[in-house]
């Protein structure tokens, strides 16, 4: 927009993208909220997963304990027999094999279910994010970098995928394994259990120190990743400007700076995270070796009733005990990283939605036999405001397109007014043109009409109704808007025109294109109205894109038009085509027009000259020329329009 916008309060770093705070606040609350999302839709699945985890963990423990029986009751007696029978040993091995098969099947089922739970939860989160994003006010998008918003959908949601599919199930499995293995070790030998627990305490101490250091760097990594995404998005959108000013090297330097910061934060985070597994593995090996030495000594001396089978079973349990301890430490980093992403996700989801206290709605209407307006179920071409009253009655007022500003003051940020005491009116069928230098307040006025922003003081009335009483969706449905920056969606030409009114027929879309003088160039496209547009209509010229935007507004058939510099980027010949189409479109409609070219507003019923948020002149072209004021100076070239 050409007008003064809300000041973006930036955080550190290029392009002003701040990130999460140095530490995740309320990690317990965040984790609880994530799990609530999971349980809301997948509680039975989670119960089944828990059962599978318990079965798998107990199967592993039982297999380790069976080693004692296998060695003491089968293998050692066989070594003392001259002609041992292998049948009992084979039967024992089959039983061990069955235990392992049960554990493997439980683990496989657990993995399959968690894939379904994880992807379903992420799908629901993305839907909630997008649904909420659509309800956010324009102010949010004006004050938040789009690349940072995209990073929430991609990177932050993906960190939750790893946590839900791997980290949390492994933590639960580790907890169950630790409890069951600890009980089994105590049952086998409390002395060896004490030795193991001393080493576990050392492992936990090291893990805590490493996690504390890596946590802050994982959050910084997410922040820096958002900055990189934002910068790439900005450079892609502004690539033509970059090339025109030959700033490719400067753009590359900016990217390198952000990329280096991402590399540093990722390196620091992963340096700590990557040493955790080797450290814990080596401490586990030391624990295993000490238990083997102590256990062997106890078995030889017969201390505590420890046998060779007991030692072997205990060593197997020792491995099973150390592994989940290491996994807990390793998955803690993954959860911290996911919580950093979850904080950004829920921060966006907790942004207040656009408020709407309106209760006056826009309806299709018709006249009854007494010539009174009544609501119609079919499209009649007559629109009316349905105004319910406190006494239970309802009145219908035909939509005329009468818009009035009375003593309006407005500022994008508190204590900084950009519009001062604006008084103007647009009668049905009038063409009101706004002219003035960049930042004068032209686009801001049109933003107030469609309530992208709300005024601080004064009143805006639409057909005599305070626009705060009109439901925003109905208010905007009554307005046809051609924005300063034309945006086309991926799809056919016909689909882009129909976006103005989704129920419009092909014939109505073609008629709108003809009205906007777009039909000629559309027919020359390879597939005509079925030509696919991609990349915001990159295969069209700027003028053709503007013509499609005007056709899109025309098919909506609105009583009020807002044309925000609609022809500022079109060549003179195309402008003449557009102007003829626009004259037909604006006939009988209230129109608010902003243009850089004064030739496009000469036939306006009223020209409003703005300067620093104030109306300094108003009148038609002849009247303003006769005054020889600011408009005269702009028209004669004494001052530039922008």
Specify the residue positions occupied by each region the protein language model found.
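Membrane-integrated ABC transporters
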Residues: 1-60, 75-96, 110-114, 118, ...
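Short intracellular "coupling" helices and adjacent cytoplasmic loop segments at the cytosolic face
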Residues: 13-22, 119, 127-151, 155-157, ...
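Juxtamembrane helix-loop junctions of ABC transporter transmembrane domains
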Residues: 20-28, 52, 59-75, 99-146, ...
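Hydrophobic alpha-helical transmembrane segments of ABC transporter permease domains
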Residues: 32, 51, 106, 110, ...
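An intracellular "coupling" helix at the cytosolic face of ABC transporter transmembrane type-1 domains
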Residues: 40-43, 138-139, 155-164, 168, ...
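Transmembrane helices of ABC transporter permease
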Residues: 41, 45-58, 99, 166-220, ...
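Helix-loop-helix
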Residues: 77, 184-198, 268, 272-343, ...
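ABC-type nucleotide-binding domain
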Residues: 82, 365-642
